[in-house]
A protein has these predicted regions:
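A juxtamembrane structural motif centered on a specific transmembrane helix
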Residues: 1-3, 318-365
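N-terminal membrane topogenic signal
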Residues: 2-21
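Helix-boundary and loop/linker segments of multi-pass membrane transporters
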Residues: 9-10, 136-137, 250-253, 295-296
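Hydrophobic alpha-helical transmembrane segments of multi-pass inner membrane proteins, especially
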Residues: 18-26, 30-224, 263-323, 348-352
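Glycine/serine-rich anion-binding loops at beta->alpha junctions
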Residues: 103-113, 153-155, 236-240, 331-346
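Transmembrane helix boundary and interhelical junction motifs in multipass membrane proteins
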Residues: 156-161, 240-245, 256-258, 275, ...
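TM-adjacent membrane-interface loops and short helices in multi-pass inner/ER membrane proteins
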Residues: 210, 214-258, 269-273
């Protein structure tokens, strides 16, 4: 059932997505409470974000897709302006200026860019002939890299990479030719030495180097990954139990509430807990994939496909980072890690997805 009809209005929703997103969010609170050593203030704050985020998701699923099509450029522009405000006027935390402080809460506007950039690109490419022509491809790639470089300059390479992928996903789904993809990949590989020496910050280069050789800095940049691997491996099949993780609760594992909460889950709930968690993520992605291929027009297919790939990419980047396959770039575990901006951004994304999937009216060309 996609919507409920009343005399004056209809409520649009997707019961499967809503149920499993809510379930994952509630389980996430359970995991976060353990990762924070039973810190009730962390739990209460995150619970507030979850509550209002779920309401926001339902609210954003009600507008017709035409609204998102028409105002996608405005949404992206506001997001980029907020990023500039964070860069020039935001507080500096750990050497980065990524947030806008409102006193009791902070906003990380780059999280909005990863949602509204693919939305705008989908609206721009909607109606283009397949395969999309060189002009549309060039303009789209320019926009993607402009937003990528703006966000990465904060510096925030992790979110920048997701933003880069979010735009490229929509471009690929819109019919980007394999020849262009292969050529671009070759150019990227050739330019790696230049990017290494001129684009990456020293600490970012150090993280990549220690990924391949932890002995270069075992008590510095390699410490996080080493402790994370120990935590994951020690969890075994059933885990050590709720609140019993030694790596996390004895302060060997850093950032337990944010970047490395996946390792905490593995240590305390073992392979069984991870299987249940990944099952929830898998179902949400498969449901979004189903909604994408059954969407009623090309714009909706591009949006649902692009946003669902952003969701699953964030998941795999976080897991890859935690298990030592990718460098540490500061990537939250979707719908679970502490942080209101990331949480709310995904609720916005799912609200848009449900809107695209549940409305019968086609977006006019």
């Amino acid at each position: 059932m996609r919507y409920l009809d009343f005399k004056r209005f209809s409520i649009y929703y997707d019961p499967y997505l809503i149920i499993f997103i809510t379930l994952l969010s509630i389980i996430g609170l359970f995991f976060l409470y353990s990762a924070s050593d039973g810190n009730s203030s962390v739990l209460i704050k995150q619970s507030i974000f979850v509550f209002f985020g779920l309401i926001l998701m339902i609210v954003l699923s009600q507008p017709d897709p035409q609204i998102y099509y028409s105002y996608s450029g405005f949404f992206l522009l506001i997001s980029v302006i907020l990023v500039f405000i964070a860069i020039f006027f935001g507080p500096e935390i750990n050497g980065a200026k990524r947030w806008i402080s409102f006193g009791f809460v902070s906003l990380q506007p780059s999280e909005l860019c990863k949602i509204f950039l693919p939305l705008f690109i989908a609206s721009y490419l909607y109606g283009a002939k397949l395969p999309i022509n060189l002009k549309n491809t060039f303009l789209t790639i320019c926009l993607i890299f402009v937003v990528f470089f703006i966000v990465s300059s904060q510096p925030d390479l992790g979110t920048g990479i997701v933003i880069l992928l979010s735009g490229l996903y929509v471009l690929f789904l819109a019919g980007l030719s394999w020849t262009f993809i292969g050529t671009s990949l070759a150019i990227f590989i050739i330019s790696l030495p230049f990017l290494w020496n001129n684009f990456l910050e020293p600490f970012q280069r150090q993280r990549i180097a220690t990924l391949f050789n932890p002995d270069l800095d075992p008590f510095g940049s390699a410490w996080n990954i080493t402790q994370s691997k120990i935590a994951i491996g020690s969890g075994g099949i059933l885990g050590k139990g709720f609140g019993e993780g030694t790596q996390s609760h004895l302060n060997f594992l850093p950032e337990t509430e944010t970047d490395f909460i996946f390792a905490v889950i593995a240590e305390e709930f073992g392979l069984v807990g991870l299987t249940i968690l990944m099952g929830l993520y898998f179902f949400i992605f498969i449901r979004c994939f189903y909604l994408s291929i059954n969407a009623r027009d090309r714009f909706c297919r591009l949006v649902i496909g692009g946003l669902s790939l952003v969701f699953i990419s964030t998941l795999f980047i976080n897991i890859g980072m935690v298990i030592g396959l990718l460098p540490v770039v500061g990537m939250p575990l979707p719908l679970i890690s502490q942080g209101g901006s990331s949480l709310i951004s995904f609720y916005i994304a799912f609200g848009i997805i449900i809107s695209m999937a549940s409305h019968k009216k086609l977006v006019p060309r």
